[in-house]
Amino acid sequence: SEWLVLGIVLGSLLPDADNLAVAVATITSSPTAGLHRTFTHSFFTVTAVIMVFQLIAVLTKRPRLGNLGLGLGIGMIMHILLDLLIWFDGVQILWPLPMWINFWEGVTPPEWFSQLMMPVEMLFFALYFAGLAALARRQGTDLGRVRGLKGWTAVQTILFLIFLVLVYTMKSGFMTIYGAVYLLSLGVATVLTIQMRQTIEAVAE
């Protein structure tokens, strides 16, 4: 099961990499429709990721790569299901087929709630980093990185508070700033996850 849990955690982050495509489209003044919650949120993509990693594992005779691929697939599915539960605009789970699944079809949340969900994502990052630090201390693993995790937890908490104010007061340009910071936060979370793999993998022992 080596790298399986690591794959699950990384896979839970992977689908939101499609925000990079949204950012590029925004910068180049191209249409952003069909870029978010489509390709990276498709069960076809999940299947392809698992199969590619299984093939690489067989060819290289490194079973842990197969475990990593399976974990990525599981994590991606978890992310997709969570998106279906907490977001109100649906997910194209069978991309490229033009079929969207929306558990909340016909339900329109209050504007203040939709706005609140954006800064809350920064809070989720903060809680994730804090959780990793607590897990490392409890297990006695990756202790040299705990201080850095505390710093990133503080950064994400501050970003949450800043965006909590800006989302309700900034009249224009909010999404550009928020999108850039979100991508940076996602990148940091990915790097820290890989760095903390000993701690994450110890969960399965």
Residue ranges and their predicted role:
Residues 1-205:
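N-terminal membrane-targeting hydrophobic helices
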